[in-house]
UniProtKB/Swiss-Prot annotation:
This is Endonuclease MutS2. NCBIfam families: mutS2. Residues 687-762 form the Smr domain. Homodimer. Binds to stalled ribosomes, contacting rRNA. Belongs to the DNA mismatch repair MutS family. MutS2 subfamily. It comes from Sulfurihydrogenibium sp. (strain YO3AOP1). Keywords: ATP-binding, DNA-binding, Endonuclease, Hydrolase, Nuclease, Nucleotide-binding, RNA-binding, rRNA-binding. Pfam families: MSSS, MutS_V, Smr. Its EC number is 3.1.-.-, 3.6.4.-. GO terms for biological process: mismatch repair; negative regulation of DNA recombination; rescue of stalled ribosome.
Length: 763
């Protein structure tokens, strides 16, 4: 694509504004140098990566990437044999390794498809990172802990400095030297500790003059008493520098062996930072990727620069569906140009794998070139008029464009007589049609409007205009023709009436009729579009209601099947129980050689009724009824009903339960009787689940709670131990799902603490 087109459509300006979403200069440079992608396969891969990253970002609400240093030069230097990196360069490599570790850890919690390769390029080097952290501090100084020798040398340096200090303090405080001392100060000159002495008294203090003040009134003397110590200090500092160089060489050599991993990780970090920047822009303005296709349909499109600069902007629909040409008409008030530039810029941004501010359902083609003719191209240097410059640019555009390109013309053709401009403009549109090139053009010329109305290659549209404020509304009305508004604006701005009347008399009746018809036509189109909008809204509501109904029907069918499965299982279990009891009776008959057990069995079972689902549903639960929780065996008596809940007494424990969780059973006066009595089991007020799997523990706990209720316990303990917390969490999740009103908490420390959960039933 031509750089002049990118500039004209403000693509570079957009990228510059987008780059403000990152604090990293290297990422900013990469973003500012982005170019639209024309290869479909490559673009789809980049969009897939951006979409996958954004979904992770939106799910987590953050990404662990902030400002990081640019280590490009350090990487290049480390690749040079025998080179030694500076402490700052090594520290910054350590910073990058820390960021890589954090990002890798964060992404490890997500299933990656399109980002997998980029993720694999992140290589945390924890040992190297620790070496660097232990060796260099945030002020880029080598730490004492970098080596034992360095720690020893620095300790000696401090000791010698202390001795020098003490010696010089004695001289400074000696009464015999007070008239010779310029200031009680110990300072450094030429890396040696000295004291300031008045020039006229320099002979009083024996030593070496290391420096003189700019005024000449002060000399800096190194007393002979500290010369040996200063010499020793100099030697120690040389040793320190050699040891630091040795440490830096060691660290650089390690870095050099890992330089490819570091380089790949750094490149991957930059790519993730670019994706992060794109995702932040997308989230801020509710952007999305349109579907790639042949048609060009952008719904509620917004100009991104308006958004980034927080300027008000009315969303527009840009539609090139079955037709490949769109001509936008209307007065010269800026609305047409904004629509044209919005279409071009959004296409460029999309082809940079950046989501754009449009609504769901939008579609867009991939263009191999987007070319625009806009503005005043007058060139003094090339001695070209505005018209000549436009013609030269249009010729180049038409030479470069093909059926996969997008041509944008702002006002066909400016800078010349309207009749000639109309003729050339129509000829250009005809040429574009012959070459089957997509085109969006703007015009206010009536002949071009008439041509477009009679040509099925093009769709015509008009930009709305507010007659009160004399400004464009920016809304695009399709199948409408824009008025010139010249007379109306002149009249509104109080141009002399006789001038307006004279002007009208100079215009042909055909043109006035055309403008009048265009105005009426636009009004009808607006009314028609409003009706269509209402119909579409009703259609959407109908679709939603239909979807709700279908989902409800599916759920009812599912519930019905599940209910019948439960009923069938109950019947099968019941039949199996009867069969087993029958076997026991037959066995007893054989053993006793008597029919009495059989007669008793028949008598007990002959009055058993199996009710249908409908009969069970028809029964209403009321006070005094014997009920049980669906799926459970314990039975209780309803003692009160309030709205959709019942208070049930289970062997002394009273619990409020939703009615839809209860099922009615025959009360005890009917033929088949049930009675809740306290069992004579040896159940204790605690259960030990340690050593069991999650499934085993929950199954055993379920049985235990049934018995606890029957025994009348209001408090019990669940012993699950500490471990990894799996059993504890499973127990508490199970308790949360129970229909009983209960509370639970960790046991006191002396009763087991976190390894024991205490449960209390509440009335």
């Amino acid at each position: 694509m031509r750089e002049r087109d990118l500039e004209s459509l403000e693509y570079r300006k957009f990228l510059n504004l987008l780059s403000s979403y990152t604090h990293n200069e290297i990422t900013k440079n990469k973003i500012n140098n982005l170019k639209p992608i024309t290869n479909r396969e490559f673009l789809e891969r980049e969009i897939a990566k951006a979409s996958e990253f954004e979904s992770i970002f939106l799910k987590e609400g953050y990404f662990p990437l902030s400002e990081f240093p640019d280590i490009t030069q350090a990487i290049n230097l480390a690749k040079v044999e025998d080179s030694i990196l500076s402490p700052k360069e090594i520290f910054e490599i350590g910073e990058i390794l820390r960021v890589v570790k954090n990002v890798k850890s964060f992404l490890s919690n997500h299933t990656l498809n399109h980002l997998k390769k980029l993720f694999q390029n992140l290589t945390p080097l924890r040992e190297l990172e620790k070496f660097i952290t232990d060796s260099i501090d945030s002020d880029f100084a080598v730490k004492d802990s970098a080596s034992k020798d360095l720690a020893r040398i620095r300790k000696e340096i401090k000791e010698v400095e202390k001795l020098i200090n003490n010696q010089l303090e004695k001289i400074l405080n000696n009464p015999n030297y007070q008239d010779a001392i310029q200031e009680k100060l110990i300072t450094l000159r030429r890396d040696r500790f000295v004291i300031p002495v008045k020039y006229n008294f320099s002979h009083r203090i024996k030593g070496i003059i290391q420096d003189r003040s700019s005024s000449g009134n002060t000399v800096y003397v190194e007393p002979f008493e500290v010369v040996p110590l200063n010499n020793k200090l100099t030697d120690l500092k040389l040793q320190e520098n050699l040891e630091i160089r040795k440490i830096l060489r060691f660290l650089t050599d390690i870095i050099r062996t890992k330089i490819n991993f570091i380089s790949n990780s750094f490149d991957a970090l930059i790519e993730f930072d670019i994706l992060y920047t794109k995702a932040k822009f997308s989230k801020a303005f509710n952007c999305r990727f349109p579907q790639i296709g042949e048609s060009y349909q952008l719904y509620n499109a917004k100009h991104p620069i308006f958004l980034l600069k927080e300027k008000p902007f009315i969303p527009i629909d840009i539609l090139l569906d079955e037709k490949r040409g769109l001509v936008i008409t209307g007065p010269n008030t800026g609305g047409k140009t904004v629509a044209l530039k919005t279409a071009g810029l959004l296409s460029l941004i999309f082809q940079s794998a950046i989501a754009i501010p449009v609504d769901e359902g939008s579609k867009i083609p991939i263009f191999n070139g987007i070319f625009i003719d806009i503005g005043d191209y007058q060139s003094i240097e090339e001695n070209l008029s505005t018209y000549s410059a436009h013609i030269k640019n249009i010729r180049e555009m038409l030479d470069l464009a093909n059926k996969n390109s997008l041509l944008l013309f702002d006002e066909l053709i400016p800078g010349t007589d309207p009749d000639f401009a109309s003729a050339i403009g129509i000829a250009i549109l005809d040429y574009v049609k012959e070459k089957n090139i997509r085109v969006i053009a703007t015009t206010h010329l009536k002949k071009i409007k008439a041509y477009v109305l009679n040509n099925d290659y093009f769709k015509i549209a008009a930009v709305g205009f507010d007659k009160e404020t004399l400004t464009p509304t920016y809304k695009i009305y399709y199948n409408a023709v824009g008025e010139s508004m010249a007379f109306y604006i002149a009249q509104k701005l109080n141009l002399q009436k006789e001038i307006i009347e004279k002007a009208k008399s100079l215009i042909s009746k055909d043109l006035l009729n055309f403008e009048e018809l265009a105005s009426k036509f636009s009004a009808l189109i607006s009314e028609y579009e409003e009706k269509i909008k209402e119909i579409n809204q009703l259609k959407q509501q109908l679709e939603l209601e239909k979807a709700k109904y279908e989902n409800l029907a599916k759920q009812l069918e599912k519930d019905k099947k599940e209910k019948w499965k439960e009923s069938l299982k109950e019947i099968q279990d019941f039949v199996e129980k009867i069969r087993q009891e029958g076997y026991e009776v037959l066995k007893e008959v054989k053993e006793r050689q008597s029919g009495a057990p059989l007669e008793k069995f028949v008598k007990e079972k002959k009055n058993i009724n199996i009710k249908t689902e409908e009969e069970i549903k028809a029964e209403e639960i009321k006070e005094g009824d014997v009920v049980r929780i669906k799926g459970k065996t314990q039975e209780g008596t309803v003692i009160a009903i309030r709205e959709d809940k019942a208070n049930v007494n289970f062997g002394g424990i009273k619990i409020w339960l939703p009615l839809n969780q209860l099922e009615k059973r025959q009360p005890k006066e009917e033929k088949t009787t049930f009675k809740i009595t306290k069992s004579k089991t040896d159940i204790t007020p605690s259960i030990n689940l340690i050593g069991k799997t999650k499934e085993e523990a929950i199954k055993e706990l379920e049985k235990y709670i049934d018995k606890v209720i029957l025994e009348g316990y209001t408090t019990f303990k669940i012993i699950h131990g500490y471990g990894a917390g799996v059993l504890r969490n499973a127990v508490r999740e199970y308790l949360d799902k129970l229909p009983f009103k209960l509370k639970y908490e960790d046991a006191p420390y002396h009763e087991g603490g976190l390894g024991v959960t205490i449960v209390r039933f509440e009335e």
